[in-house]
Amino acid sequence: MILFITACENGPVEYKPESGSVSGKVTFQNIDNWPSSSSIAIALSLYWPPQGAPAAFTSISYDSLIINQNVGSYNYIFENITLNRAYGSIAVSWKDPNDNNSETNQHVLGAYGGSLAAEFWDADSIMLTDDIYEIENLDFIVDLD
């Protein structure tokens, strides 16, 4: 009889994620001003201010809001996001239905870390890495007034 015994190292297992995710909640104030035409979207953009196509985006419908009085909230998540790079912003925008120019028809309504007083130029960037590949609670407020 031959007996083979093998052992493995008891060190930590290193997990290398292939992609990451960011998530949070957008609180919409004054939702009675929700646009009746056109659309509102949330996007994760590579640059700030946004230039070109976003890394990820989704449309937000009025029906998808959790409504309490005149405030609505929307929980978002962007998954399968490329790691080891910075993203310029997460922003909510409104598409002007009377402007066909894709470079001027999106109007920023709010951005993560940004303030209306600074016209959202102070939006925070987001960095996903092999070590920090899931970022949660990137919450911000959009006032539709």
Where in the sequence are the language-model features?
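Tryptophan-paired
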Residues: P49-Y87
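A short, solvent-exposed beta-strand micro-motif common in secreted/extracellular proteins
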Residues: L83-N101
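Structured interaction patches on ligand/partner-binding surfaces of diverse proteins
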Residues: K95-N137
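Conserved "repeat-terminator" motif of extracellular CCP/Sushi domains
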Residues: L138-D145
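Bacterial Sec-dependent N-terminal signal peptides
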Residues: I2-Q29
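Short, ordered, surface-exposed loop/turn motifs in non-cytosolic proteins
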Residues: I31-T58
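Predominantly extracellular/luminal cell-surface or secreted proteins
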Residues: T27, A41-P49, I90-D96
